[in-house]
Amino acid sequence: MEDVCTECGFDQSSTPAADVGPALERTATEVADAVRSVPLELLRRRPEPRTWAPIEYLGHLRESMAFHRWLIEQAVAQDHPEVPMVDPDESVAAADYRGADVEDLLGQFHRRVMRLGAHLAALPPGAAACSLTLGDRPITVALIARSAWHECHHHLGDIRRPGGL
């Protein structure tokens, strides 16, 4: 989780957590449109063995939205909890998203984005400054919120690339 991504150019480091929800929802709509635009023959195909297929990026984003909301809940409910780092490659491989129904995944992704947005809108005053340690790195709720937005923005480019969109 970084405030600025040199790979995709994302920099919303000055965006308050309360403003992330609506922006995240707009970006998630772009993700859904991009997934639906990928030709079916490319949707489940990995362009390279270590590069996810577009449907795997969607599955990862579905997981990621729930994980970000859970992180925020932990940071607000506990006094600086410690959370182990997760390996997204392992979770994507275990989930076998290439065999999943794309419309089911899109629906789940949409619901998780909406839940995260609602959760961000309902944060009590001062909650954006609450923090936790992810792996060995302390992060705030504000950074976690922006990271969810970044995940969607960044992987939107990944989804568009294989389909030539």
Name what the model sees in each region.
Residues M1-E2, R44-P88, A129-L165:
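Short, contiguous alpha-helical
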Residues M1-R26:
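Terminal targeting/low-complexity segments that flank the catalytic cores of oxidoreductases
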Residues A17-A28, T51-L58, G99-L106, V141-A145:
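Amphipathic, non-membrane alpha-helical segments in soluble helical-bundle scaffolds
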Residues G21, A32, I55-L58, R62, ...:
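Non-transmembrane alpha-helical segments in soluble domains
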Residues A23-T27, A32, E90-A129, A148:
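Acidic/histidine-rich alpha-helical segments that form the ligand environment
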Residues R26-W52:
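A glycine-rich, hydrophobic loop/mini-helix early in the fold
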Residues S37-L42, A121-A129, G164-L165:
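Surface-exposed helix-capping loop/turn segments at secondary-structure junctions
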